[in-house]
């Protein structure tokens, strides 16, 4: 109530008279009866908050009749605020007591009657709902406004609901409102969804009721409501009940009409209230010109229609007399009963001719009614192909007559075709030109123009006669109706020539076509509003203007065409004659159009006669009275003052608000107020709105509002940055930074505009603060920062030669901090667009002027040595320029401050969000510095990155670089070495900043863990003098922000990178022999410092030979190195820098050391990278030591000094450091990747463990953590050997939850003696990138490792990765004799690291003690010793104690035989990562060899030649792809899996195993097992030998019927593609099994042949094994992918107990292995898996991608699980616990968590529940309503995405009409849909339903087609159940039966089907996962408390939570851990994805 004004009269009564009335009632009852009645009515009308409670009970409570209020029902109120009309009063009274069809001509008050009825039902039923249905949104809004103004229903009780209202909002509205205005479709949806309380509906008003024909939404609403209740009133409103009596009867029946209230235009009742309508019919002859074109067109028609007439499919009649409708009927008849005489013809030809004739006849109708132009536009659409009628176009193009006619029309309208198409109403020509040029395409147009002009002339003359000359001219309005938009456009164009007298506007409906643009609802409303208010005086409209819309009074209506339906004519005529005399002119063309009009008039009269007589209509006889017997409401007239209507829906345009149409081009160009047009140029407010805002809302000085300011802040650790503070202003209001902190740690929902990146940064900072606040004891973040916030790091050495160190040192250190791992802790980065001032103010630089002023730089320029300037890019100097001087001038200090902050900024930006899109203001300042550099004449010649910025990385957008304008001046480079260094650094930097760090959540226990590791492995100090001279770039962190995606893989200039320098630091390097390479290297420890920082202060006691200054950096670093190295390890740095480069190009000569740094480092095409994904290429330099980049400086271009050699200590220490970090010190691994610096000078053995550390995690750790990497190097040997650094990011991340205490004891201390000359780059450079071939691991040369002890503690993971990644022998690999053997047990390390916390005591694993490493000088073959069983050496493969790597399978060339060597586990990491990662089609056999390697007693060290070409690198897993297609040993042959342990010989002679002589004893099944065994791959006993062609696994798997068990068991068609790929693409059809290769141990015949394990023997053997379950495992499990067969067989559940290694995939498991790990629980497995997932969203480093893969593989292949004899048995367990039925058979594997079905899932309502897809609302409404109303099922309508119905956790039902299957048109769509269903559900059922017969049609038997039968057969063959139904009700019965069946099998839906709040968001996330059905997502919502819980769950838990098979759970598990590289995204998504995903993780 505004201003105290009464809202309604009853409200006033209620307030004033209510209490007195009650008192009087209680006492004497003196009040007047009328007053009592009024008071009762007022009490009901009182807008009480709770309408259900009657505040004034009155004479009695609500009656029994559905909540009827007796007090209110005593009377019915008729408003008197409008003049009373008797016919309205009569109709309102009638409509209150029976269902009524109200027929009134337009403009005579139908809406008023409806408002009265609605208002009274609103009073009578306080808890009831009143509905008003209107067919369009515009009508809904209009009627709502009308009812509110007429009857005063409170706005808070009304709601408008259209398609724009969200379902959740509607649910709330249904619960809180009582009067609804909505479209019928929304009503149907809400009834089907159960949102609308159907039983509460008391009154239903239907507008435009004549539409209620057939299956219209009106009919569905009434039918659905009547299923629940009959107690509701129906009031139908229409001006024209139907086009004929049959249609009227249908309306009456559908709407349950009991009576009709009809007033025709001739009725005496309405005559006083309707003005005369003068209807004129004008018939226009066609004319000669149009007649000629018509004759030519008929000639064309005869040609094509004649074809059909000849074939007898079209009636023989006069061609011009045919109509489009007649041809359509003929086509339908032909389809139903094809003529026998046309059997030989292709039906497609006849169909095509029908379509052609229909198109031509439509054009003929256009020609006759609309004219030549409309015909031409239509034909243009056909001939230019826009209408898609290709055949029609071709046929017409071959017809000479047509082309002649078409050319004639083209010449006539050549200039107008375009005009019409673009919808422009106006041309820039003068009126006279337009008049001359306009072509009247039809004589009717001329007549129309005459009528309109005449009307305005006469009106103008009439105006001039009156006193108000000119004032009333605007009042006249003309409306023109035409059926087609082209005609509308033409008419408007014609009339627009008479502007301004005629102000014309078009009015059309919503756009449905491709070319024509319609009006939106807002545009329509705006047009109507302007027309009503006089903005336009002429409106040209299509039929959309005929109905409903209140367009005001129209004086002249012109119908440009006739309509056959009398309804439309009446509707058109109703637009006029409402308030004054109106005129209707119908312009008709001579001929057919005239006949059509006459016919419609005749129909109209007959309809009115039939209705008024009520003789022919059958009415509904059971209309409810709604009012209880004995109550007869009396009429009470009341004046109602309605409250001012305020539309509360955003869909409505508030009055006075300028429409968005102002922006629309040419829409309102004719009549637009200039003042309004320009209001949007500068604001979003119009001048009027601005004035209101300025007056009411603008804050002024006298308002007392103080200006808000931020409080002064400071860094505790950076006190010196802020020395001055400004005095506080009195008028300012100091904001509190902590007051709102509780809301600032998470993003709040947004609408339209998302949070900014800065906001997300801030939120992450607040999250960090919140985490720190809750910490107890030491602050982990403080510990992280402590090593980085040292003054030594901030203030650069004042040595002119060492300018570059400050920034890089700090940046790199900060970079490696834990914050990088946890993106949530990252502070915000200033936005790119922020100005410099803002950035510096944020970072508390007191003076921002200096960085921008050239003079400041000029002062210091003289102190910058030229060589420094030359060797450093200006961008590097930006930060450190001033800092290099010794004297600290104020300017210098200021710049230093900036420098520090920029370093910090760089740290902040280093990852995902500091991509190209996030260039900050700091960068701008840097650019300014650069400008100043150039302006003051600094020497820029050596700016080595010019080519990089300008040419190589188009995406860089000069982020952290000079703009392109600056690049040219830097083109010259003083030395190639420096150039390489710079570019390398830049590339690293870019990579470093391209990715986001992992979330904090996974780092909880890391510090304690790290400290523990440090104590375990104290880090010896190593002196290292690094060549930083070439890496000045390392000094400017700003350059670190380069996006990795910008690094061209081929760019040779990028070889040397910061990571490189970091790596270089790890080794003591000798002075570069070339001055250019030195570049001040010896004098620049700062460069070393930068490396130093990269390495996280590895504790290098500086070798300050040439470098005293280095001391400065080392000091203090070493003190903290023990504590901090964990966080700031080179690896981490490298990770950041080279995020995606986990695939390194393989160079034969690239020694592998610290893989990541180098590998990543060499992002440009580094030899260090075995492969760089698709873009990676072999290093251009071939064997040239491009790997020298690893060496850092001089080696960047192969310029390394020949005499340079690496010191042993540093590399060893590095490796040691890694081991310390992860406690891998006792594990033996060979480095099969480059460690990031060239080991060329390092004489130590390089451990590839780091590679594994860096890479394996990709594969084996669910998180990208490298922590899992186990370095196998013994600490002692490491001291002398090359120290491998595990990137902290990896190491630390994965540490959580992983028992890092399982180092592999490295027994040999001989590592140190291997020497790697700088010139040779070891072949193995690390796991290739996903998509690139992994290089073969090179084993360290000259090493002997002694005993099985080495592998005693190898984690089980070791083997997981080992087999996955065993490299193949590449015959092409050649290594220089002196090349370092860098592949050192990486596979083991990978595997170890993958263990994620489980340590296996492999004590009994008879590992070969003779671990021999080939001498260093041996040839590549001998060096790379691949250990495989000699092909003919031993016949009994199973007995072989040696691990063989059958590289033959991975390599096209036979591998060279080599000596056996102890297992230094081969390079798992590189292979895995590559294969599993991005190259789905790569073969993986080589790895499979590795998989079989660590077998039985002697696990041999596998070596591979170091030179691995990209082509062959990924083939290591090829063998692994030949998976055993076996579901169950017990079902097939018990020996099929267990004996695989010894089948390691690569000999082809073993293809058939002759030793098995006992086969006669076996039954058929076991005989088949013998055969299967004989064809297995010798390298992998459980793998079959297959053709070694690479192919996509999907090509094979997709052909395997899901339920063909025999095929799955016998199948040898197994994919050679990469395992992981298979798992991803077709994982639903595979299963992985752990195989114990030692099952047949000690069981052999005298002949040495392997004894086949029969079931009995296996059982006995298993029993023995169970007794020894506590014994350490000696066997290496191997994963086998088994084709999944999800048929319905269910076998007995194995009850064998024992801790089993869980092969997540179901399949065979080694009993010994399973039972031998009592100490290993599934908890660590879950934990490690979880760790990975948490980091996943935060980082997308390529190196990490591999580790992620590794962890996933580990989890899915090697975790403890219930012991089960076979996949089927395991599956059975899972199926039982998941309450699935037998058909799940092989879709699940044994999972530890499968046995724990969540109780939450079992608790649910007992009522049957069915999920229904929302699309079924329209096509299957009866099914839904029958399920609910008839069968009592709970039906939840939701967007299922696939499937129409879900009846249980495992069954989905697709409902198809018979016609869909009869026709082949939709074959592909049906197939795809069913395939998608099979991917989500165990069982799929198709219900084939007969097509619905329309009313009046006779059901016809449809002929079965061949396609129909073939489809049914295919469905059955695919295991899909097919049911048949005759109608929707029968379909509902079938669905109920299916649901009951599934309930009996414990698979029923038993979780709440609706979710709200955050669970809705969870549901949306789960639905985004592939192959997750809606029900599975629901189950997960209710089972897992959060998404995080689900993501961190094991596959078995996911299976139990989602109630899906274990296999699908594993698919989800894999998907969640899929290594995703954001750089693969399009640029538009890349920046957004990086920022949003990282911050929100």
From Swiss-Prot:
SUPFAM superfamilies per the UniProt record, alphabetical: P-loop containing nucleoside triphosphate hydrolases, Restriction endonuclease-like, RuvA domain 2-like
- Bias class Low complexity marks the residues at 1170-1181
> What is its subcellular localisation?
Nucleus
Q: Where is the composition biased (Gly residues)?
A: 1319-1329
Q: What is its EC number?
A: 3.6.4.13
Domain Helicase ATP-binding: start-end pairs: 91-259
Modifications made to the protein after synthesis = Phosphorylated; hyperphosphorylated in response to genotoxic stress.
Q: What is this protein called?
A: Fanconi anemia group M protein
Q: Which GO terms describe its molecular function?
A: 3'-5' DNA helicase activity; ATP binding; ATP hydrolysis activity; DNA binding; nuclease activity; RNA helicase activity
Q: What is the lineage of its organism?
A: Eukaryota, Metazoa, Chordata, Craniata, Vertebrata
Subunit comment for this entry?
Answer: Component of the Fanconi anemia (FA) core complex. The FA core complex associates with Bloom syndrome (BLM) complex. This supercomplex between FA and BLM complexes has been called BRAFT.
**Top EC class, one word:** hydrolase
Q: Where is the Helicase C-terminal domain?
A: 447-631
Q: Where is this motif: DEAH box?
A: 207-210
What is the stated purpose of this protein? DNA-dependent ATPase component of the Fanconi anemia (FA) core complex. Required for the normal activation of the FA pathway, leading to monoubiquitination of the FANCI-FANCD2 complex in response to DNA damage, cellular resistance to DNA cross-linking drugs, and prevention of chromosomal breakage. In complex with CENPS and CENPX, binds double-stranded DNA (dsDNA), fork-structured DNA (fsDNA) and Holliday junction substrates. Its ATP-dependent DNA branch migration activity can process branched DNA structures such as a movable replication fork.
Main location group: nucleus
Q: Could you state one GO biological process linked to this protein? A: DNA repair
What reaction does this catalyse?
ATP + H2O = ADP + phosphate + H(+)
List keywords of the entry alphabetically.
ATP-binding, DNA damage, DNA repair, DNA-binding, Helicase, Hydrolase, Nucleotide-binding, Nucleus, Phosphoprotein
- Cite the record's Pro residues compositional bias ranges: 48-60
Q: What residue spans carry the region label Disordered?
A: 1-64, 802-822, 848-874, 1070-1124, 1158-1208, 1301-1403, 1465-1491, 1685-1740
Q: Which InterPro entries match?
A: DEAD/DEAH_box_helicase_dom, ERCC4_domain, FANCM-MHF-bd, FANCM/Mph1-like_ID, FANCM_DEXDc, Helicase_ATP-bd, Helicase_C-like, P-loop_NTPase
Polar residues bias spans = 802-814, 1375-1389, 1685-1697
Organism expressing this protein natively: Gallus gallus
């Amino acid at each position: 109530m505004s201003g105290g004004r009464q809202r309604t009269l009853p409200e006033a009564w209620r307030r004033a008279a209510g209490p007195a009335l009650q008192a009087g009632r209680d006492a004497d009852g003196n009040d007047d009866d009328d007053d009592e009645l009024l008071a009762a009515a007022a009490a009901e009308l009182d807008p009480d908050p709770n309408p259900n409670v009657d505040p004034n009970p009155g004479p009695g409570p609500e009656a029994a009749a559905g909540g009827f209020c007796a007090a209110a029902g005593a009377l019915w109120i008729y408003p008197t605020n409008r003049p009373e009309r008797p016919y309205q009063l009569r109709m309102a009274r009638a409509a209150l007591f029976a269902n009524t069809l109200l027929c009134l001509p337009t403009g005579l008050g139908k809406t008023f009657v409806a408002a009265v009825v609605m208002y009274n039902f609103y009073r009578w039923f306080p808890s009831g709902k009143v509905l008003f249905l209107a067919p369009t949104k515009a009508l809904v809004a209009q009627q709502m406004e009308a009812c509110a103004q007429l009857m005063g229903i409170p706005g808070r009780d009304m709601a408008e609901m259209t398609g724009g209202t969200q379902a959740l909002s509607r649910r709330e509205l249904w619960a809180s409102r009582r009067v609804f205005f909505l479209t019928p479709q929304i009503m149907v949806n809400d009834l089907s969804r159960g949102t609308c309380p159907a039983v509460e509906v008391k009154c239903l008003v239907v507008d435009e009721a004549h539409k209620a024909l057939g299956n219209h939404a009106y009919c569905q609403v009434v039918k659905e409501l009547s299923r629940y209740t009959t107690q509701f009133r129906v009031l139908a409103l229409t001006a024209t009940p139907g086009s004929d009596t049959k249609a009227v009867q249908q309306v009456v029946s559908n709407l349950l009409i009991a009576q009709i209230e009809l007033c025709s235009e001739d009725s005496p009742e309405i005559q006083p209230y309707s003005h005369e309508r003068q209807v004129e019919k004008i018939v226009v002859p066609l004319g000669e010109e149009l007649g000629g074109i018509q004759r030519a067109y008929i000639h064309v028609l005869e040609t094509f229609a004649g074809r059909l007439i000849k074939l007898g499919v079209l009636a023989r009649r006069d061609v011009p007399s045919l109509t489009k409708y007649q041809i359509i009927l003929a086509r339908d008849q032909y389809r139903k009963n094809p003529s026998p005489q046309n059997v030989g013809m292709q039906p497609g030809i006849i169909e095509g001719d029908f379509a052609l004739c229909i198109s031509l006849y439509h054009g003929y109708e256009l020609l006759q009614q609309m004219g030549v132009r409309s015909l031409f536009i239509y034909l243009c659409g056909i001939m230019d192909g826009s209408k898609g009628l290709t055949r029609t176009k071709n046929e017409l193009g071959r017809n000479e007559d047509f082309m002649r006619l078409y050319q004639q029309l083209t010449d006539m309208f050549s200039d107008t075709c375009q005009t019409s198409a673009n919808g422009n109403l106006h041309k820039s020509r003068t009126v006279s030109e337009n008049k001359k040029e306009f072509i009247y395409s039809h004589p009717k147009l001329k007549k129309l123009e005459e009528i309109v002009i005449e009307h305005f002339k006469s009106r103008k003359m009439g105006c001039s006669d009156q006193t108000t000359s000119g004032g009333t001219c605007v009042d006249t309005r003309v409306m023109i109706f035409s059926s087609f938009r082209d005609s509308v456009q033409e008419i408007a164009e014609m009339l627009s020539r008479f502007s301004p007298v005629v102000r014309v506007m078009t009015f059309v409906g919503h756009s449905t076509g491709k070319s024509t643009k319609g009006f939106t609802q807002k545009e329509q409303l705006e047009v109507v509003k302007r027309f009503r208010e006089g903005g336009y005086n002429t409106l040209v409209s299509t039929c959309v203007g005929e109905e409903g819309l209140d367009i005001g009074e129209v004086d002249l209506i012109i119908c440009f065409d006739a309509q056959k339906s009398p309804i439309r004519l009446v509707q058109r005529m109703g637009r006029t004659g409402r308030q004054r005399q109106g005129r209707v002119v119908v312009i008709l063309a001579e001929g057919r159009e005239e006949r059509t009009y006459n016919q419609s008039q005749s129909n109209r009269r007959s309809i009115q006669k039939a209705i008024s007589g009520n003789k022919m209509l059958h009415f509904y006889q059971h209309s409810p009275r709604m009012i209880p017997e004995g109550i007869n409401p009396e009429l009470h007239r009341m004046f109602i003052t309605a409250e001012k209507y305020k539309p509360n829906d955003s869909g409505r345009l508030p009055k006075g608000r300028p429409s968005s149409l102002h922006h629309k081009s040419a829409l309102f160009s004719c009549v637009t107020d200039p003042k309004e047009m320009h209001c949007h140029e500068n604001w979003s407010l119009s001048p009027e709105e601005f004035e209101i805002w300025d007056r009411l809302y603008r804050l002024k000085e006298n308002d007392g509002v103080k200006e808000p300011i931020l409080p002064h802040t400071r860094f505790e650790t950076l006190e010196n940055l802020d020395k001055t503070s400004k005095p506080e202003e009195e008028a300012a209001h100091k904001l509190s930074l902590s007051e709102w902190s509780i809301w600032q740690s998470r993003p709040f929902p947004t609408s339209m505009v998302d949070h900014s990146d800065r906001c997300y940064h801030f939120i992450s900072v607040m999250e960090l603060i919140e985490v720190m606040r809750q910490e107890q004891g030491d602050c982990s973040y403080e510990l992280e920062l402590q090593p980085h916030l040292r003054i030594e790091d901030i203030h650069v050495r004042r040595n002119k030669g060492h300018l570059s160190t400050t920034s890089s040192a700090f940046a790199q250190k900060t970079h490696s901090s834990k914050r990088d791992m946890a993106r949530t802790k990252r502070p915000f980065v200033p936005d790119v667009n922020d100005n410099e001032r803002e950035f510096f103010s944020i970072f508390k630089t007191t003076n921002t002027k200096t960085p921008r002023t050239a003079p400041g730089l000029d002062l210091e320029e003289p102190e910058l040595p030229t060589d420094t300037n030359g060797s450093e890019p200006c961008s590097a100097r930006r930060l450190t320029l001033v800092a290099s001087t010794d004297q600290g001038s104020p300017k210098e200090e200021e710049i230093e401050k900036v420098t520090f902050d920029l370093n910090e900024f760089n740290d902040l930006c280093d990852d995902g969000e500091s991509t190209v899109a996030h260039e900050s203001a700091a960068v701008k300042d840097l650019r300014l510095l650069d400008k100043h550099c150039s302006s003051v004449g600094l020497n820029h010649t050596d700016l080595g990155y010019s080519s990089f910025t300008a040419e190589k990385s188009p995406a860089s957008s000069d982020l952290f670089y000079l703009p392109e304008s600056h690049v040219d001046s830097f083109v010259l480079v003083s030395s190639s070495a420096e150039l390489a260094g710079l570019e390398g650094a830049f590339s690293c930097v870019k990579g470093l900043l391209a990715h986001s760090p992992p979330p904090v959540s996974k780092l909880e226990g890391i510090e304690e863990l790290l400290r523990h590791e440090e104590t375990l492995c104290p880090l010896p100090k190593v002196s290292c003098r690094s060549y930083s001279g070439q890496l000045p770039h390392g000094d400017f962190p700003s350059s670190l922000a380069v996006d990795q995606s910008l690094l061209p893989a081929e760019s040779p200039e990028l070889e040397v990178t910061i990571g490189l320098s970091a790596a270089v630091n790890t080794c003591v390097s000798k002075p570069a022999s070339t001055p250019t390479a030195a570049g001040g290297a010896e004098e620049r420890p700062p460069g070393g410092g930068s490396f130093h920082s990269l390495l996280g202060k590895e504790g290098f006691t500086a070798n300050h030979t040439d470098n005293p200054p280095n001391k400065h950096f080392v000091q203090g670093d070493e003190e903290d190195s023990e504590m901090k190295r964990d966080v700031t390890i080179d690896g981490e740095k490298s990770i950041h820098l080279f995020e995606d480069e986990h695939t390194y190009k393989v160079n034969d000569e690239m020694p592998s050391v610290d893989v990541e740094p180098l590998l990543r480092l060499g992002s440009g095409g580094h030899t260090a990278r075995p492969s760089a994904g698709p873009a990676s290429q072999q290093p251009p330099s071939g064997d040239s030591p491009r790997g020298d980049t690893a060496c850092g400086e001089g080696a960047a271009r192969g310029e390394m000094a020949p005499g340079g050699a690496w010191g042993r200590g540093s590399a060893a220490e590095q490796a040691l450091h890694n081991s310390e970090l992860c406690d891998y010190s006792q594990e033996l691994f060979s480095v099969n990747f480059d460690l990031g610096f060239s080991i060329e000078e390092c004489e130590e053995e390089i451990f590839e463990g780091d590679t594994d550390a860096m890479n394996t995690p990709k594969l084996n750790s669910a998180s990208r953590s490298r922590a899992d990497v186990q370095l196998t190097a013994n600490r002692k040997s490491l001291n002398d050997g090359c120290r491998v650094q595990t990137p902290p990011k990896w190491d630390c991340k994965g540490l959580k939850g992983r028992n890092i205490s399982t180092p592999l004891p490295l027994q040999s201390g001989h590592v140190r003696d291997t020497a790697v000359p700088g010139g040779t780059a070891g072949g193995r450079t690390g796991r290739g990138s996903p998509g690139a071939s992994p290089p073969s691991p090179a084993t360290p040369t000259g090493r002997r490792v002694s005993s099985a002890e080495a592998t005693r503690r190898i984690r089980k993971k070791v083997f997981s990765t080992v087999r996955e990644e065993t490299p193949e022998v590449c015959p092409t690999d050649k290594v220089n004799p002196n090349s370092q053997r860098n592949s050192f047990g990486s596979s083991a390390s990978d595997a170890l690291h993958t263990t994620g916390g489980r340590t296996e005591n492999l004590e009994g694993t008879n590992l070969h003690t003779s671990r021999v490493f080939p001498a260093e000088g041996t040839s590549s073959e001998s060096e790379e010793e691949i250990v495989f069983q000699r092909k003919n050496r031993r016949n009994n493969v199973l007995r072989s104690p040696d691990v063989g790597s059958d590289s033959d399978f991975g390599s096209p060339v036979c591998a060279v035989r080599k000596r056996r060597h102890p297992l230094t586990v081969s390079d798992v990491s590189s292979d895995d990562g590559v294969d599993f990662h991005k190259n789905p089609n790569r073969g993986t056999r080589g790895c499979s060899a590795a998989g079989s390697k660590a077998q039985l007693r002697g696990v041999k060290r596998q070596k591979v030649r170091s030179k691995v070409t990209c082509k062959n690198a990924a083939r290591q897993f090829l063998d692994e792809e030949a998976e055993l297609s076996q579901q169950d040993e017990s079902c097939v042959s018990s020996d099929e899996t267990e004996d695989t342990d010894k089948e390691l010989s690569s000999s082809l002679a073993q293809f058939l195993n002759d030793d098995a002589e006992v086969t006669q004893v076996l039954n058929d099944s076991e005989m088949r097992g013998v055969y299967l065994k004989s064809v297995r791959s010798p390298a992998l006993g459980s793998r079959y030998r297959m053709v070694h062609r690479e192919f996509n696994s999907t090509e094979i798997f997709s052909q395997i019927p899901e339920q063909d068990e025999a095929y799955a068991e016998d199948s040898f068609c197994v994919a050679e593609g990469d395992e992981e790929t298979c798992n991803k693409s077709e994982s639903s059809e595979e299963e992985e099994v752990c195989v114990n290769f030692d099952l047949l141990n000690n069981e052999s015949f005298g002949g040495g042949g392997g004894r086949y394990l029969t079931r009995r023997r296996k059982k006995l053997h298993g029993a023995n094994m169970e007794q020894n379950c506590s014994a350490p495992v000696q066997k290496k499990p191997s994963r086998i992918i088994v084709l999944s067969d999800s048929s319905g067989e269910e076998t007995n559940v194995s009850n064998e107990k024992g801790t089993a290694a869980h092969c997540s995939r179901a399949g065979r498991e080694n009993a010994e292995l399973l039972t031998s790990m009592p100490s290993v629980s599934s908890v660590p497995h879950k934990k490690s898996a979880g760790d990975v997932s948490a980091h996943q969203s935060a980082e997308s480093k390529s190196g990490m991608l591999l580790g992620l893969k590794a962890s996933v593989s580990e989890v899915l292949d090697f975790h403890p699980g219930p012991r089960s004899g076979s996949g089927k048995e395991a599956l059975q367990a899972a199926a039982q616990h998941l309450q699935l039925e037998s058909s799940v058979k092989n879709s699940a594997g044994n999972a530890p968590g499968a046995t724990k079905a969540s109780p939450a899932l079992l608790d649910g309502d007992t009522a049957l529940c069915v999920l229904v897809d929302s699309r079924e609302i329209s096509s299957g409404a009866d099914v839904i309503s029958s399920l609910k109303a008839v069968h009592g099922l709970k039906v939840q309508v939701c967007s299922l995405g696939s499937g129409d119905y879900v009846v249980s956790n495992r069954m989905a039902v697709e409902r198809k009409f018979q016609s869909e299957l009869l026709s082949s048109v939709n074959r592909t769509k049906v197939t795809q849909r069913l395939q998608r269903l099979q991917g989500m559900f165990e069982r799929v059922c198709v219900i084939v339903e007969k097509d619905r017969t329309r009313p009046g049609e006779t059901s016809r038997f449809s002929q079965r087609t061949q396609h129909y039968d073939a489809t049914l057969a295919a469905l059955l063959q695919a295991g899909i159940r097919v049911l048949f139904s005759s109608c929707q009700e029968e379909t509902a019965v079938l669905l109920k039966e299916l649901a009951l069946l599934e309930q009996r099998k414990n698979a029923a839906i038993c979780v709440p089907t609706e979710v709200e709040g955050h669970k809705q968001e969870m549901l949306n996330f789960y639905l985004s996962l592939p192959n997750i059905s809606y029900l599975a997502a629901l189950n997960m919502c209710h089972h897992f408390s959060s998404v995080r819980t689900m993501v961190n769950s094991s596959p078995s838990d996911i299976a139990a939570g989602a109630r899906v098979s274990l296999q699908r759970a594993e698919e989800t598990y894999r998907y969640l851990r899929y290594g995703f590289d954001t750089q693969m995204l399009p640029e538009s998504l890349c920046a957004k994805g990086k920022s949003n995903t990282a911050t929100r993780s």
